[in-house]
Structures are given as C-alpha cells and as structure tokens.
Amino acid sequence: MTNIPIDRLSLNQMKDLIRLEKRLSQSVLGQNEAIEQLARAIRRNKAGLNRQSGPLGSFIFLGPTGVGKTELARVLAREVFGGEDSLIKIDMSEFSERHTASRLVGAPAGYVGYEDGGKLTDKVRRRPYSVVLFDEIEKAHPDVLNLLLQILEDGKLSDSHGRTVSFQQTIVILTSNVGAEQMIQDSELGFGASGQKKSASENRHEKNSRAALRELEEFLRPELIGRFDNVITFKPLSRSIVRRIFDNLTSDLVKAVARHGMTLDITSSAKRWLIDRGFDEQRGVRVLRRTIQSELADPLSDVLLSNKAKPGDTLEAKIDNDKVVINVNRA
C-alpha cells in the first residue's frame, strides 16, 4: 500500500484494505484465522465503528515462539503504512524495572537521559503512522501497563518534556508466549486435514486460547485486556506449513542463482535435512532462516565465486555425509 495517512486513502487504497487478508497471508503462512481477525478489526476501526479516541487498531498476539507473531506485525506495517520501517518494536525485557519503564516517555528532569527523549514517544512523534509492537509484554514493569492503558483510552501520551504524542494513527500490538507450552504439547505436526482431525484441532485451539487468556490475566488486568480490539492466538505450525515457509525463504536464493543464468535445484532430501535442522516445536521457524543461510547459501556462494559453474548449468543441492553439497550439472 502507501505511507499516505490512512484517513486520506483513495478509493483504490481503501480496496487494498478490503483485500488485506490476502496480502498478509501471502507472507505469513499457517495463521489464516489470526489474519482474518486482525484485518476485520482494522476495517471496523477505519469505518468508524469502534472507539474513536484510541489507536487505529490494538491487538494482543499469543502463541509459541517462531510461529509468525512478529512477522505478521512487520508485514502489517508494510501493507498498511508503506514499509517495514513503519514498525516500531519495543523489547519489554529492557523495561522490566521502574526506572527503565520511565524511559519510554523520557527520563524526568535532572536525571540521566532527560535530553534523549522517550524511547517510545520520540519514535511515534517522528513516525505517527506506524505499527507499535510491545514484544513479550509479560516481562514489562507494571508502570508500562499503565502507559498502555492511557494509550488505549486516550490515544495519546505526554513525554517528559510535556509534549503530547498522538497514537491515534498507530496500530498497537502486544506479543506474549503465555500458554505456549500447552499449545506445543497439543499440536499435531504432519497430519492431514480430514474433517475429523480438523474439528479436533479446532477444538484444541479454542481450549488452548481460553487457557492462554486465563494465564494472560495473571499479569494483565482485565480492564486493560478489555480495551484491546482482539486477543489473537496463533497456532503451532504444521509440517506442511513449514515446507511452504521453506519454499518462501529459499525463493530469493533461487532468484539470485537465476540472475547468474543458472538453475538451483534443492533435492527433497536436502529440503528435509534443512527443515529438520532449522525447525522444532519449541523454536518454530525462528532459526530456519539462519540454517538456510549457513548450510545452503554459504556452500552455494562458494561455488558461484569459484567460477566452477557457468550460465546454463544446474546447481543441485543434496546431502552427502550429513551436510549440504552443491553439484554442478552441465547444461
């Protein structure tokens, strides 16, 4: 989309909001239900059907590590505000103490850091059309939660210099891993999508969502949770979804090799080996990208830079002695 303020969007750009699910699901796989809830709430707010004083949208993302929570926030920033640089990510582990929590709006006068401004307010003041991501909210000091309540109720904060910063054109997202262990234990990786299994999976997801919400209420007050548009629970990734994510992650390598006039062929055994190395239920696909870089892209770059291959050749990635090797097959 564009970085034009969302209250000035043209008819064509408004149509992009109608197609938001499709655009998001092209980049974030396996989380269709989460994407649908997110897109519907944003459209309701844009149509003026929700609170007018708060942010454009506000959400809590629950789920295991590496299933797409942060990635969805990043893609949302790109699709709604025109670029991934419109994502403001705040790591809550850095704001777990009272004196660090105050840094979000700026240190008080006379304290170290007063001239630096607020870690949150300064960023939003410079980029008022943005997705603001509070990552791992369970690690935040309670003072941070009070600031969040003010953002959701009033749509603004005052920094330590007395300047008012508007959050009304931001999308506010909290992420949390609460309930993740139970979700992972109950997940069924690699099963088909028969009606019976799908129904059982949906029932487990609903049960785990309720359990995660109860756990969330142990550190977030119900009145704060109630201010959010949606609490969205992400599902653990199935094996079939991970294979599609692998294809997405390796597509840039395929294109890069094609620019050399060559073809990259990743054998099924190499694909399985890389997925096994880069994915597990506890970490999701968080390390899959790094695994592809170190185990596939590195030997591939060695072949390209050594002039062992020439235009028209096929570079075959396969497994030999428990590692990826690149064979050059002449045209």
Q: Language-model segments: which ranges?
A:
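AAA+ P-loop NTPase nucleotide-binding core of proteostasis motors
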Residues: 1-331
